[in-house]
């Protein structure tokens, strides 16, 4: 199933993706304002991939409670302000990557809580 879903992602239009873009890795830089006031931590695993991945990391993190209406509003805000040319494609990638990322997070969490691997 995942292979079929991943085939739906546009692998030609790659962007820099930090892959760990969530609240714990954002910091406020006190003497700056606007976009310059946001600092990023833990970016050493950056790769080229779908721009939707980092937005998913921020808005759909299984470890955080983000109001679904707020997440939808922020997704629409991103689409309105960003350089996304195919909004339907972006939304589809967003959904696919949200599923993938949150399954991964939940498997890791369960594995740690049980102190044993899920798969051998």
Q: Would you name each region that the model predicts?
A:
Residues 20, 73, 92-93:
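Residue-level signal for alpha-helical context at structural boundaries
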Residues 23:
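Nucleotide-sugar donor-binding/catalytic module of glycosyltransferases
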Residues 1-19, 27-41, 49, 61, ...:
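ATP-dependent phospho-/nucleotidyl transfer catalytic cores
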Residues 1-8, 12, 83-120:
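Helix-rich C-terminal or lid/interface subdomains of diverse kinases
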Residues 51-85, 99-114:
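Active-site activation/catalytic loop segments of kinase-like enzymes and analogous catalytic loops
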